[in-house]
Amino acid sequence: MDYFDSITNDHVFPKSWYLRSAPKNIEKWQVPSCAQCNNIYSKLEEELLTHLALCLNTKNNDEKNIQRNILRSITPEYGKNAKDVNSRTKKRKKLLADISFFKEIPSYGILPNFGPTTKIVLPEYRTIRISPINLEKFGEKLTKGFTYIFYNLLINKTDEIQVIIHENRNINFVKELFQKFAYKHNNLGNSIIIERIKTEDNTEINILYYFNIWQKLQFYSYVKKMK
Protein backbone atom coordinates (compact mmCIF):
# COMPACT_ATOMS: atom_id res chain seq x y z
CA MET A 1 0.00 0.00 0.00
CA ASP A 2 1.27 3.48 -0.91
CA TYR A 3 -0.13 7.00 -0.79
CA PHE A 4 -1.23 8.77 -3.99
CA ASP A 5 -2.81 12.17 -4.59
CA SER A 6 -5.42 10.69 -6.93
CA ILE A 7 -6.82 7.22 -7.52
CA THR A 8 -8.91 5.37 -10.06
CA ASN A 9 -10.96 2.17 -9.83
CA ASP A 10 -9.78 -1.18 -11.14
CA HIS A 11 -11.74 -4.41 -11.65
CA VAL A 12 -10.29 -7.09 -9.41
CA PHE A 13 -11.21 -9.78 -11.94
CA PRO A 14 -10.68 -8.29 -15.42
CA LYS A 15 -13.84 -7.48 -17.38
CA SER A 16 -12.47 -9.09 -20.53
CA TRP A 17 -11.98 -12.39 -18.67
CA TYR A 18 -15.67 -12.90 -17.89
CA LEU A 19 -17.34 -15.59 -19.97
CA ARG A 20 -20.28 -14.67 -22.16
CA SER A 21 -22.44 -17.08 -20.12
CA ALA A 22 -21.75 -15.21 -16.87
CA PRO A 23 -24.98 -13.98 -15.19
CA LYS A 24 -25.83 -10.45 -16.32
CA ASN A 25 -26.64 -9.19 -12.81
CA ILE A 26 -23.39 -10.19 -11.10
CA GLU A 27 -21.31 -7.64 -9.25
CA LYS A 28 -18.01 -7.06 -11.01
CA TRP A 29 -15.94 -6.03 -8.03
CA GLN A 30 -13.79 -2.91 -8.22
CA VAL A 31 -11.20 -1.53 -5.82
CA PRO A 32 -9.31 1.78 -5.55
CA SER A 33 -6.09 1.84 -7.56
CA CYS A 34 -3.50 4.37 -8.62
CA ALA A 35 -3.46 5.10 -12.36
CA GLN A 36 0.04 3.68 -12.77
CA CYS A 37 -0.83 0.34 -11.13
CA ASN A 38 -4.07 0.18 -13.10
CA ASN A 39 -2.15 0.60 -16.34
CA ILE A 40 0.52 -1.95 -15.39
CA TYR A 41 -2.04 -4.60 -14.46
CA SER A 42 -4.13 -3.92 -17.56
CA LYS A 43 -1.14 -4.67 -19.80
CA LEU A 44 -0.22 -7.75 -17.77
CA GLU A 45 -3.79 -9.09 -17.91
CA GLU A 46 -4.04 -8.45 -21.64
CA GLU A 47 -0.80 -10.32 -22.32
CA LEU A 48 -1.82 -13.24 -20.11
CA LEU A 49 -5.26 -13.48 -21.68
CA THR A 50 -3.81 -13.33 -25.19
CA HIS A 51 -1.50 -16.27 -24.49
CA LEU A 52 -4.00 -18.34 -22.49
CA ALA A 53 -6.76 -17.84 -25.05
CA LEU A 54 -4.81 -19.70 -27.72
CA CYS A 55 -4.85 -22.78 -25.48
CA LEU A 56 -8.61 -22.83 -24.88
CA ASN A 57 -11.00 -25.48 -26.16
CA THR A 58 -12.83 -24.22 -29.26
CA LYS A 59 -15.52 -26.89 -28.77
CA ASN A 60 -16.66 -24.92 -25.72
CA ASN A 61 -18.70 -21.88 -26.81
CA ASP A 62 -17.51 -19.69 -23.92
CA GLU A 63 -13.86 -20.49 -24.52
CA LYS A 64 -14.29 -20.18 -28.27
CA ASN A 65 -15.72 -16.69 -27.81
CA ILE A 66 -12.70 -15.55 -25.75
CA GLN A 67 -10.32 -16.98 -28.32
CA ARG A 68 -12.19 -15.33 -31.19
CA ASN A 69 -11.99 -11.92 -29.49
CA ILE A 70 -8.27 -12.32 -28.87
CA LEU A 71 -7.53 -13.40 -32.44
CA ARG A 72 -9.47 -10.39 -33.68
CA SER A 73 -7.42 -8.09 -31.43
CA ILE A 74 -4.16 -9.19 -33.09
CA THR A 75 -5.46 -9.12 -36.66
CA PRO A 76 -4.28 -5.93 -38.44
CA GLU A 77 -7.18 -6.06 -40.92
CA TYR A 78 -9.56 -5.15 -38.11
CA GLY A 79 -7.62 -2.00 -37.20
CA LYS A 80 -9.67 1.20 -37.04
CA ASN A 81 -6.80 3.46 -38.09
CA ALA A 82 -3.07 3.38 -38.82
CA LYS A 83 -2.14 3.50 -35.14
CA ASP A 84 -4.49 0.62 -34.33
CA VAL A 85 -3.19 -1.44 -37.26
CA ASN A 86 0.39 -0.90 -36.05
CA SER A 87 -0.55 -1.90 -32.49
CA ARG A 88 -2.24 -5.11 -33.64
CA THR A 89 0.73 -5.94 -35.87
CA LYS A 90 3.17 -5.56 -32.96
CA LYS A 91 0.99 -7.70 -30.67
CA ARG A 92 0.78 -10.40 -33.33
CA LYS A 93 4.54 -10.38 -33.91
CA LYS A 94 5.24 -10.58 -30.17
CA LEU A 95 2.77 -13.44 -29.76
CA LEU A 96 4.23 -15.46 -32.64
CA ALA A 97 7.70 -15.08 -31.11
CA ASP A 98 6.47 -16.93 -28.00
CA ILE A 99 5.24 -19.97 -29.96
CA SER A 100 7.47 -23.06 -30.12
CA PHE A 101 7.10 -26.42 -31.86
CA PHE A 102 7.85 -29.84 -30.36
CA LYS A 103 7.93 -33.28 -31.94
CA GLU A 104 6.73 -34.77 -28.65
CA ILE A 105 4.66 -33.37 -25.80
CA PRO A 106 7.05 -31.97 -23.16
CA SER A 107 7.12 -34.09 -20.00
CA TYR A 108 7.19 -31.05 -17.72
CA GLY A 109 6.44 -27.34 -17.69
CA ILE A 110 2.89 -27.56 -19.07
CA LEU A 111 0.36 -25.42 -17.21
CA PRO A 112 -2.21 -27.78 -15.60
CA ASN A 113 -5.44 -28.08 -17.64
CA PHE A 114 -3.81 -26.39 -20.64
CA GLY A 115 -2.23 -29.45 -22.20
CA PRO A 116 -3.30 -31.36 -25.33
CA THR A 117 -7.06 -31.91 -25.62
CA THR A 118 -6.73 -35.01 -27.79
CA LYS A 119 -4.84 -38.29 -27.50
CA ILE A 120 -4.26 -38.38 -31.24
CA VAL A 121 -0.55 -38.36 -32.07
CA LEU A 122 0.30 -35.31 -34.16
CA PRO A 123 3.34 -34.61 -36.36
CA GLU A 124 4.22 -31.70 -34.07
CA TYR A 125 2.80 -29.81 -31.11
CA ARG A 126 2.56 -26.05 -30.83
CA THR A 127 3.19 -24.53 -27.42
CA ILE A 128 3.12 -20.96 -26.21
CA ARG A 129 5.14 -19.54 -23.36
CA ILE A 130 3.15 -18.32 -20.36
CA SER A 131 5.17 -15.97 -18.16
CA PRO A 132 5.38 -17.39 -14.61
CA ILE A 133 6.10 -13.88 -13.36
CA ASN A 134 2.89 -12.56 -14.93
CA LEU A 135 0.91 -15.47 -13.47
CA GLU A 136 2.31 -14.75 -10.02
CA LYS A 137 1.63 -11.01 -10.27
CA PHE A 138 -1.90 -11.71 -11.49
CA GLY A 139 -2.44 -14.02 -8.52
CA GLU A 140 -1.11 -11.35 -6.18
CA LYS A 141 -3.51 -8.80 -7.68
CA LEU A 142 -6.52 -11.08 -7.13
CA THR A 143 -5.35 -11.79 -3.60
CA LYS A 144 -4.91 -8.11 -2.71
CA GLY A 145 -8.18 -7.09 -4.35
CA PHE A 146 -10.36 -9.77 -2.80
CA THR A 147 -8.77 -9.29 0.62
CA TYR A 148 -9.92 -5.68 0.40
CA ILE A 149 -13.39 -6.66 -0.90
CA PHE A 150 -14.11 -9.49 1.55
CA TYR A 151 -12.26 -8.33 4.67
CA ASN A 152 -11.71 -4.58 4.18
CA LEU A 153 -8.00 -5.15 4.71
CA LEU A 154 -5.14 -3.51 2.83
CA ILE A 155 -2.04 -5.54 2.02
CA ASN A 156 1.14 -3.68 2.95
CA LYS A 157 4.63 -4.19 1.57
CA THR A 158 5.63 -5.86 4.84
CA ASP A 159 2.87 -8.47 4.51
CA GLU A 160 3.60 -11.82 2.91
CA ILE A 161 1.83 -13.15 -0.21
CA GLN A 162 2.50 -16.47 -1.90
CA VAL A 163 0.89 -17.70 -5.12
CA ILE A 164 0.98 -21.45 -5.81
CA ILE A 165 0.23 -23.01 -9.20
CA HIS A 166 -0.44 -26.65 -8.36
CA GLU A 167 -0.29 -29.77 -10.51
CA ASN A 168 -2.80 -31.86 -8.53
CA ARG A 169 0.04 -33.60 -6.76
CA ASN A 170 0.59 -33.75 -3.01
CA ILE A 171 -2.14 -31.23 -2.24
CA ASN A 172 -4.84 -33.54 -0.87
CA PHE A 173 -4.50 -32.04 2.61
CA VAL A 174 -5.06 -28.57 1.13
CA LYS A 175 -8.15 -29.75 -0.74
CA GLU A 176 -9.53 -31.31 2.45
CA LEU A 177 -8.90 -28.07 4.32
CA PHE A 178 -10.94 -26.11 1.80
CA GLN A 179 -13.70 -28.73 1.72
CA LYS A 180 -14.13 -28.44 5.48
CA PHE A 181 -13.66 -24.75 6.17
CA ALA A 182 -13.82 -22.62 3.02
CA TYR A 183 -16.43 -20.01 2.16
CA LYS A 184 -17.23 -20.45 -1.52
CA HIS A 185 -18.24 -17.83 -4.11
CA ASN A 186 -19.60 -19.57 -7.19
CA ASN A 187 -22.26 -17.12 -8.37
CA LEU A 188 -20.12 -15.91 -11.29
CA GLY A 189 -20.79 -18.94 -13.45
CA ASN A 190 -17.58 -20.55 -14.65
CA SER A 191 -15.80 -17.21 -15.07
CA ILE A 192 -14.21 -17.48 -11.64
CA ILE A 193 -14.87 -19.51 -8.50
CA ILE A 194 -13.34 -18.20 -5.29
CA GLU A 195 -12.89 -20.10 -2.03
CA ARG A 196 -11.40 -18.52 1.07
CA ILE A 197 -10.38 -19.38 4.62
CA LYS A 198 -9.39 -16.84 7.28
CA THR A 199 -7.73 -17.45 10.63
CA GLU A 200 -6.23 -15.01 13.11
CA ASP A 201 -4.68 -14.77 16.54
CA ASN A 202 -3.33 -11.91 18.63
CA THR A 203 -0.43 -11.14 16.30
CA GLU A 204 -1.33 -12.07 12.72
CA ILE A 205 -4.05 -12.76 10.18
CA ASN A 206 -3.77 -15.66 7.75
CA ILE A 207 -5.95 -15.95 4.65
CA LEU A 208 -5.98 -18.78 2.13
CA TYR A 209 -7.55 -18.49 -1.32
CA TYR A 210 -8.38 -20.93 -4.08
CA PHE A 211 -9.10 -19.44 -7.51
CA ASN A 212 -10.62 -21.42 -10.38
CA ILE A 213 -10.89 -19.46 -13.62
CA TRP A 214 -12.95 -20.91 -16.51
CA GLN A 215 -12.72 -24.33 -14.81
CA LYS A 216 -9.16 -24.41 -16.17
CA LEU A 217 -6.68 -21.97 -14.62
CA GLN A 218 -6.43 -22.95 -10.96
CA PHE A 219 -4.14 -21.75 -8.22
CA TYR A 220 -3.92 -21.07 -4.50
CA SER A 221 -2.64 -18.04 -2.66
CA TYR A 222 -1.73 -17.28 0.91
CA VAL A 223 -1.63 -14.01 2.85
CA LYS A 224 0.15 -13.51 6.15
CA LYS A 225 -0.64 -10.10 7.59
CA MET A 226 0.75 -8.78 10.85
CA LYS A 227 -1.67 -6.92 13.11
Which residues are covered by each model-predicted region?
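Short flanking/linker segments adjacent to small metal-binding domains or redox-active Cys/His motifs
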Residues: 71-114
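Extended, surface-exposed interaction regions
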Residues: 48-68, 94-97
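C-terminal, charged low-complexity interaction regions
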Residues: 103-227
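Hydrophobic/aromatic-lined pockets within catalytic cores
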Residues: 17, 38-42, 147
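Histidine-centered nuclease catalytic patch
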Residues: 1-30, 46-47
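Exposed alpha-helical structural elements
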Residues: 47-48, 65, 69, 134-137, ...
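Short Fe-S-cluster ligation motifs
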Residues: 26-36, 63-78
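Short Cys/His-centered divalent metal-binding micro-motifs
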Residues: 30-51
